[in-house]
């Protein structure tokens, strides 16, 4: 028999309630695991209720990832174009958050004319809609897949392919982590901030981080995160954070 391990298991309250609707089926599934390693205390408790016998909680294993070496770093020609830019990212954004970030960009630009905002939407199929939304503010927008359209006047770069986030966290001073200001997603809010935090970024986020409360509380104690409630607060925080450039690794 090959041992079956559930690694870095995370169950949100929403997911747990779904499993409870088919509790007998859930117990049949989860009892097949020889070991479950939970990513947080809440998940550990939910797994116990679902019948898991052997549970360990070592915390979120994403903290153990080595992000010091980023594979496939950004193209040198692109890096040369942005070498004098003040860069921040809006990552894992959801509907409504991109427009909020664009408004903040305009306010920050009054202070730093060389600011570059990089938007990494959670779902890249939304990029064309985001583009139309941002152009309504008369912003110069470029796509990562079409870097020939990127120049010194570009305000916002939209990342329209998956698996690129770490490259941009590596050059950004701070990151707004999305799914935290969309009021329609309060019951299923928040995205994981560990990766940008490990790459030395200040984490800005809205008040709604339900799915990752434990992680945000931990990072807050370390002084890594800051909660903002609207685009004005985001703008003020960005102006403060972008005073100095990100230290080179």
Describe the predicted segments one by one:
Residues 1-249:
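Nucleotide-activated sugar donor-binding and catalytic core shared by glycosyltransferases
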